[in-house]
Regions:
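Conserved ABC ATPase "signature" region
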Residues: 81-88, 133-155, 207
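Conserved catalytic motifs of ABC-family nucleotide-binding domains
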Residues: 181
Length: 221
């Protein structure tokens, strides 16, 4: 499914059964510039939804609003509702860090930590209190398998993630997000910096992931 950010009509589903997240009259300002003009949109569970449109149409701004990544940009103001499990994510009293465990993000360019492959997966888990080595090992293996990377790295888990290819790094970033057990994955043009073969691998990975996750992706193509 795709949604053109130049189209303002409402796309709806039965919220009780199918909708993972929706926005109502979502507007985003950067200072005096209104970048998003009141978008109403619903995202179906276990579906890949693509936000498409030309550069500057607000795709990434909208996507980053869904888990409050725009909060860190000075002068940004977001109004309207972002509803996830009957809770407005845009409320100021929301625990943003806990929310981002449920609504994960993968960015345009691969951004692995300058740590080992293993530590890339476990870093956030440890910060949230997980210390059981066996459980961490299981999560690392499961996450890397879901991201179609396990077979390529299972013998090199303690080597630097920076030694991986661009496509492998992006799949590692997907695995890192999966490790937090999110319901929703947001991806901002995740293959734009990759070669065609790596792009195909990432796309195939996302198709397989939609069985367990709701995927919202920004793309030019």
């Amino acid at each position: 499914m795709s949604y053109d950010m130049n189209d303002r009509h409402l796309i709806t589903f039965d919220k009780d059964d199918k909708v993972a997240l929706y926005t109502e009259d979502l507007k985003v300002w950067y200072g005096q510039n209104e970048a998003i003009h009141g978008v109403d949109l619903e995202f179906e569970k276990n579906c890949i939804t693509a936000l498409i449109g030309p550069s500057g149409s607000g795709k990434s701004t909208y996507l980053r609003s869904l888990n409050r990544m725009n909060d860190g940009i000075s002068g940004t103001n977001v109004t309207g509702k972002i509803m996830y499990k009957d809770v407005d994510v845009n409320r100021k009293d929301i625990d943003v860090y806990e929310m981002r465990k449920r609504i994960g993000m993968v960015f345009q360019r691969p951004n692995p930590f300058s740590k080992s492959i293993y530590e890339n997966i476990t870093f956030a888990l440890k910060r949230h209190g997980e210390r059981d080595k066996q459980k961490l090992d299981e999560i690392v293996e499961s996450s890397l398998k879901q991201a179609a990377l396990w077979e390529q790295v299972k013998d090199n888990l303690h080597k630097s993630a920076l030694a991986l290819s661009g496509g492998q790094q992006q799949r590692l970033c997907i695995a890192r997000a999966i490790a937090m057990k999110p319901d929703i994955l947001l991806l901002d043009e995740p293959a734009s910096a990759l070669d065609p073969i790596s792009t195909g691998t990432v796309e195939e990975t996302l198709v397989n992931l939609k069985e367990n996750y709701t995927i919202i992706i920004v793309t030019h193509n």
